[in-house]
Amino acid sequence: MSKQLAAQVPAEPVVLGKMGSSYGIRGWLRVFSSTEDAESIFDYQPWFIQKAGQWQQVQLESWKHHNQDLIIKLKGVDDRDAANLLTNCEIVVDSSQLPALEEGDYYWKDLMGCQVVTAEGYDLGKVIDMMETGSNDVLVIKANLKDAFGIKERLVPFLDGQVIKKVDLATRTIEVDWDPGF
């Protein structure tokens, strides 16, 4: 099915998607892509999965659209039983495979866990998720336990220059112009 590569494992793993249920009897699987354009997941190779705590490299043999789904065929996965063993496995690549971004652009993975503070120094909390709304991305911030406003979660639009004043990935902080009461 796949070969284990002790020497070649992702140094900085990034999850790009997940394998879904098997499709048919010849080892095809549904795939759920987390990339902005769903088909972009196929641009990043090799893929790694984790089985029983060990990294394994899997090779994409083929992929195609089926109704609303993307389905994949992996080398060495030739029947439904082998495919079922991979259901729910995350598709991982090394972050070095991702393209470099322009100044002011960030990967969501880099913003996760950043502390968010207002320009006045009020600690809003930590980024726990991101949402795509169509017009702009939104930071989902888990507020600190002793938040002065009693807020558990904040949604702050990622509008560079307007709301987002400074992103410092080295110190893992994001400075925002935002009313802590919201």
Curated annotation (Swiss-Prot):
GO terms for biological process: ribosomal small subunit biogenesis; rRNA processing. GO terms for molecular function: ribosome binding. Belongs to the RimM family. Binds ribosomal protein uS19. It comes from Salmonella paratyphi B (strain ATCC BAA-1250 / SPB7). An accessory protein needed during the final step in the assembly of 30S ribosomal subunit, possibly for assembly of the head region. Essential for efficient processing of 16S rRNA. May be needed both before and after RbfA during the maturation of 16S rRNA. It has affinity for free ribosomal 30S subunits but not for 70S ribosomes. GO terms for cellular component: cytoplasm; ribosome. The lineage of its organism: Bacteria, Pseudomonadati, Pseudomonadota, Gammaproteobacteria, Enterobacterales. The keyword Chaperone applies. Pfam families: PRC_RimM, RimM. This is Ribosome maturation factor RimM. It comes from the Bacteria. Gene3D superfamilies: PRC-barrel domain (2.30.30.240), RimM (2.40.30.60).
